[in-house]
């Protein structure tokens, strides 16, 4: 260390290394290197080309080549993996015609609105139909056999509902007393309504309806005795009281079919019928020919008469006799819930022709049988001949062994009429349905 406190160092010579000398390549060596590089490139290019060719070949075989199929007996080439839809589109559907679009009732809406075509896969009896919705999902197999034909007709879109099916009405004939033998019950059926056409069609019954059946029978009282019912129409009138008096004197009973309009004008006589032990029934309100009136008017004719008779006598009947006896299946369908029975007759005295008291009497006596119902009148015209004939009729019938009863008593003596009909207490069951008529 010197006086300044520093170390002194000796200078040393440092030798710098010389660069290495690279031997220079000869021309032969350079040629060998170039040849090797070129060979590599050739091999590489050949390899790449081979890959490309292999890819193209694979793509061709796998994706682009055509495969043979048979359509309608003709050979057709189709791109591999094509669907049936592709095959059809690419061949203009082989010239077949589309089906039609039909309404729910079968009318043509569009000539070409149906299935575009129909396709079956396979040959002969082994051919299977292919649904149109599977055309785009089904691949055409090499060697496949197809039959392409005209498209099927298609029914328009529609709403389907289940609707009630109204019962019909059946009417027996041949008897003097008509009544409900079987109540009707609705069934059900399928209904289609077309979305385009608006048509509504019945597509089939689900449950059959039960028809309303109207029985028609004569009363046949059982036992050894004979019974007959005298009936009087069109009252009450000024002749009614005389007839009631004769019945009372003879201790006989009859059935009176009063008109509502007549009872409204003679309420005391309507009450006198009931008070005398006779049967009060309805001849409707205004003696209209019921098959010629509408449903509402028909029901009004029946109900108004019942109301009037009840107001006059205190008794509400259910028994009617339709004017002229005209009460068809249509009238029953429209009003079966209102009445117990419609009473016709077995013996027509034709008293309205005024044939004379003797003729009226002979008609009843000559035509009488057990269970018979005889038709006479206490209103609607001059009824003096009926009044004159009545005593002889009663006496003659009794001499022949007959007991005079009301129509309800006649049915009771028969023993086979429904009790609600006999008693005038018919009520339509809650599960019953009325027929639909025009």
Predicted regions located by residue number:
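Catalytic domains of cell-wall/extracellular-matrix polysaccharide-remodeling enzymes
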Residues: 242, 264-265, 288-403, 407-424
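Short, recurring structural edge motifs at helix starts
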Residues: 72-78, 131-135
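LysM (lysin motif) carbohydrate-binding repeats in extracellular/periplasmic proteins that recognize
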Residues: 80-117, 121-126
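Eukaryote-biased recognition of intrinsically disordered, low-complexity regulatory segments
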Residues: 56-76
